[in-house]
């Protein structure tokens, strides 16, 4: 795998508050976007458009960005290795930014999708939930991102990563947050990952010392969760 930087970073973390958690942050953001080719042949971002390889783009917050681990240890890169292992020709692009909200994701999606993609993995909303933002806005922002992907890459398979949050905002809010992912997936006929952090969220040994971010082992489990869902569509 060979990685290259595509964008600058946004700094802030996401809060893992209980067994089911999302990702939150402050308003100051840092993060990075990286690209890897499966199998690796170049580090130039332009290659995805000029080669015959297909492109899978991971679009999310600190979970996708791999906060606190090396780019090669984050789950998108690990999924790329799995793609290599079965001989599929994909360029894997990590467009995760730590601290990202759905509003932020909506604002930058046009820039990110300057080139067409074949598979788009959408992982956003955790920061919205942990901040208690109106879920009507979260839903609208996610729908806008989906609509933009469909407009710019009509052939793309869209995968939506479900998230859950602790009950701090109340039972009704927590339930509505959890269910909006399936509702959006059903409405738009998306491929759904029911819960991205399945078997990782809230488990100390699978998270970094801050108890917030998945560690290397945690990212391996997340990669397996993602791979089980996306392998059939590649």
Question: PLM features: residue spans?
Answer:
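Signal peptide-proximal N-terminal region
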Residues: 78-92
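Active-site metal-binding loops of divalent metal-dependent hydrolases
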Residues: 61-62, 126
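Short, solvent-exposed loop/turn elements at domain surfaces
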Residues: 64-70, 102-103
């Amino acid at each position: 795998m060979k990685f290259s930087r595509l964008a600058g970073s946004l700094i802030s973390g996401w809060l893992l508050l209980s067994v089911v958690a999302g990702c939150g942050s402050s308003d100051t953001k840092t993060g990075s976007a990286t690209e890897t080719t499966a199998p690796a042949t170049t580090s130039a971002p332009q290659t995805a458009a000029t080669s015959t390889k297909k492109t899978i783009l991971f679009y999310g917050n600190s979970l996708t960005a791999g906060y606190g681990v090396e780019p090669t240890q984050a789950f998108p890169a690990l999924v790329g290795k799995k793609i290599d292992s079965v001989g599929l020709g994909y360029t894997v692009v990590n467009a995760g930014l730590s601290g990202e909200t759905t509003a932020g994701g909506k604002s930058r999606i046009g820039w990110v999708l300057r080139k067409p993609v074949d598979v788009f993995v959408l992982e956003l909303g955790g920061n919205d939930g942990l901040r208690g933002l109106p879920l009507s806005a979260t839903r609208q922002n996610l729908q806008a991102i989906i609509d933009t992907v469909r407009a710019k890459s009509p052939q793309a398979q869209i995968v939506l990563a479900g998230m859950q949050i602790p009950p701090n905002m109340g039972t009704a809010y927590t339930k509505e947050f959890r269910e909006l992912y399936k509702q959006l997936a059903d409405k738009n006929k998306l491929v759904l990952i029911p819960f991205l952090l399945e078997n990782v969220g809230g488990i100390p040994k699978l998270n970094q010392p801050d108890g917030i971010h998945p560690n290397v082992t945690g990212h391996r489990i997340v990669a397996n969760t993602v791979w089980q869902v996306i392998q059939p569509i590649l």
